[in-house]
Amino acid sequence: MIVEEIQGNIANLSNSEKQKHVEKVYLENSDLVKRIQRVVTDHGTEIGIRLKQPIDLQYGDILYADDHNMIVVDVNSEDLLVIQPRTLQEMGDIAHQLGNRHLPAQFTETEMLVQYDYLVEDLLKSLGIPYVREDRKVNKAFRHIGHSHD
């Protein structure tokens, strides 16, 4: 089977639609940005992914669906630093520092997530910014944004 487009996301399905039999494709965070790849579901089904559009995969994306079954993307957990700034000043300070290092980050209402790096952990300790090291799933890929200093 070759998948060329995403059928939707399980987050947008009705409760009755979520009752279908689900096979999962477990991906590493770095694989979410790959438009072309071969994967195997947790039931052993081989799938080729060749997305027509240049979009990243996300947790819950439906790769295939029929009346009874669906194949859904799941994301393996990852070693993260979960940064929990107490003030806007702390958020600005750490965001500036991480931006200078070109580190991709993700945000929730109260947290900043970065992939584990011992240098970042040392920086957080030295600045006194609260954080925890945690194994956690993220919904989207950590993506580097290119730019120049010209």
Curated annotation (Swiss-Prot):
Pfam families cross-referenced by the UniProt entry: UreE_C, UreE_N
Summary of the function given for this chain in its UniProt record: Involved in urease metallocenter assembly. Binds nickel. Probably functions as a nickel donor during metallocenter assembly.
Protein name: Urease accessory protein UreE
Homology family: Belongs to the UreE family.
Gene: ureE
NCBIfam families (UniProt xref): PRK13261.2-1
The UniProt record lists the keyword Cytoplasm: yes
Record-level GO BP terms: protein folding; protein-containing complex assembly; urea metabolic process
Organism listed in the record: Staphylococcus aureus (strain MRSA252)
